[in-house]
Regions:
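Long, hydrophobic alpha-helical transmembrane bundles and adjoining juxtamembrane helices/loops
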Residues: 1-3, 7-518
Length: 518
């Protein structure tokens, strides 16, 4: 996922959800502004919610916001004015907790029966081809730019991969395991590509922006882990993208004033390759490095209790340990690649056709070689070579997708929309589409809402509900990010962080006491 992370990595979406249809745009804006004012006075000049993090009406002598005067504390104190101002955000929190309750009911109770997974290659292919055909005929849109790897294109790429990834889980389509590994590698590639593009071009290393990225990757999964008592690594996409995002961020943050130097960027990438090699391939280093984080990154499958708790994290993170660096490389050379494809576009028709034909021929030969050499390997053998070869199919796809102006200028909107919610669909599938029943259980069964003799109708109903809820989670995550993670006031951000930590500690103590009492 999406999960995900600038570029095609982890889209933030609109800063304020457009889902609150029962209110006018002015009412929505006023409510969010008032709520933010209870956290810190809104910047009346810009009117931008992301800037609404200035000084509160009640501040200390130095102009800094007092902890007791932030909106959350005033709400806890029963301040009617603060509660009224925060009504939309409180409604968002209430909706979030209701969704978590739905997760619990579907996956931890016997309210709905479980169904057995059944794979039909014919049905699997038919679903995807039908969706793709509909997308091509009904939702083909022109991009805002014809640049290679533009935002719409990467969202589309994530979208169709996510559809296949989810169908793979739903039907247990083990025969496409190697393809799924490549899809996940492509997501990780986008982490390197998107984050490098953002930090290298915009040079925005602010704590606020970084915190918003961490919120996007981890906010919802944290609540799911708490509500369902699951380990963080069960949703391995989230910690994996978080780790590689941290690598990209800090590698560019160090000596950031020299990031305009090609030699410095090359040196940083070489250092990253060496670092990754040492961590994952020198025996013992991984264990020592991540030992302090074992409390967070350990995972025990109930069906395999004797496996080392850190094995899952080592395996998952190690499969794609290099490809995010390749994403950084691609982002760095992207301007030259864009200049090349535009140079080809400007050639006379005859010359352009020859060049594009040559590109397609070489790319096709490379694809055939990769397929017959690596893709056809059995699962375990493929896993061994995957970390070193996943960049090949990614490059092949990029070249095919961008070889002509027409190919770069259009995208399939329905897949683009799917690509925006990859992180949410990834997390939600475990509990309201599939079923595991126990903490840390792998989702080996299906959620059943209809009688067993209607598997196709059950699939359609569950999918409609599941996608709708995932879309709402995406919107809620962004709505709450606006209020809770200010991006221009580090003092206010730190107060919110202190409050959040205190709240989680308090809830943890209360929950432990409740469990002991039961």
């Amino acid at each position: 996922g999406g999960g995900g992370g600038g570029g095609g990595n982890t889209p933030d979406g609109s800063m304020i959800s457009n889902s609150m249809q029962d209110m006018s745009d002015e009412d929505k804006k006023r409510s969010f502004a008032n709520f933010t004012d209870s956290f810190g006075r809104q910047n009346s000049q810009s009117g931008n919610m992301s800037d609404a993090v200035g000084a509160s009406p009640s501040t200390g002598d130095n102009g800094n916001v007092k902890f007791t005067n932030i909106g959350a504390m005033r709400i806890l104190q029963g301040d009617a004015d603060a509660i009224e101002r925060a009504r939309l955000i409180l409604r968002s929190w209430a909706e979030l907790f209701f969704i978590l309750f739905v997760f619990y009911v579907c996956d931890r109770t016997n309210t709905f029966p479980e169904r057995t997974k059944s794979y039909s290659r014919d049905f699997f292919i038919a679903i995807f081809v039908t969706l793709a055909a509909y997308g091509c005929y009904q939702t083909l849109r022109q991009s805002k730019t014809s640049a290679p790897l533009n935002r719409e294109q990467t969202e589309e790429w994530k979208g169709w991969m996510q559809v296949l990834f989810l169908l793979y889980h739903y039907f247990k389509a083990s025969e496409i395991y190697n393809a799924i590994r490549i899809f996940i590698a492509a997501y990780v590639w986008m982490t390197g590509f998107g984050n490098f593009s953002y930090y290298h071009v915009r040079k925005d290393f602010s704590v606020g922006r970084f915190s918003q990225m961490m919120w996007r990757l981890n906010f919802f999964v944290l609540f799911v882990c708490i509500a369902l008592r699951n380990d963080y690594v069960l949703y391995y996409i989230c910690p994996m993208h978080t780790l590689f995002t941290l690598f990209v961020y800090f590698s560019l943050l160090v000596f950031k004033e020299h990031n305009t130097s090609t030699n410095m960027i090359v040196a940083k990438m070489v250092i990253l390759i060496v670092l990754v090699y040492v961590i994952w391939e020198v025996p013992g280093v991984f264990t020592v490095l991540f030992k302090p984080f074992e409390w967070l990154l350990s995972y025990t499958d109930p069906k395999k209790p004797d496996v080392n708790p850190m094995h899952e994290w080592f395996f998952r993170s190690g499969l794609d340990r290099y490809v995010w660096i390749y994403g950084m490389v691609c982002a760095f050379v992207h301007p030259k690649y864009e200049a090349f494809v535009r140079w080809v576009d400007e050639k006379p028709t005859k010359e352009k056709t020859v060049i594009q034909g040559l590109i397609l021929t070489v790319n096709t030969i490379a694809a055939y070689w990769w397929y017959t050499t690596y893709y056809v390997l059995p699962k375990l053998e493929y896993n061994v070579v995957h970390p070193y070869t996943s960049w090949i199919p990614i490059t092949i796809f990029i070249i095919f997708r961008n070889f002509s102006l027409t190919m770069r200028s259009y995208f399939i909107h329905i897949f683009c929309e799917c690509g925006k919610i990859t992180l949410e669909t990834y997390i939600s599938q475990f509990h309201i589409w599939l079923s595991s029943s126990v903490p840390n259980g792998q989702p080996g069964m299906l959620l059943g809402l209809l009688p067993e003799e209607y598997p196709v109708l059950n699939f359609m109903l569950c999918t409609a509900i599941y996608v709708g809820i995932s879309q709402r989670i995406f919107m809620l995550t962004n709505d709450l990010k606006v209020a809770c993670v200010p991006n221009a006031n580090n003092r206010l951000l730190s107060l919110h962080a202190y409050f959040g930590v205190a709240w989680f500690i308090g809830m943890g103590i209360a929950g432990s006491a409740l469990l002991m009492a039961i």
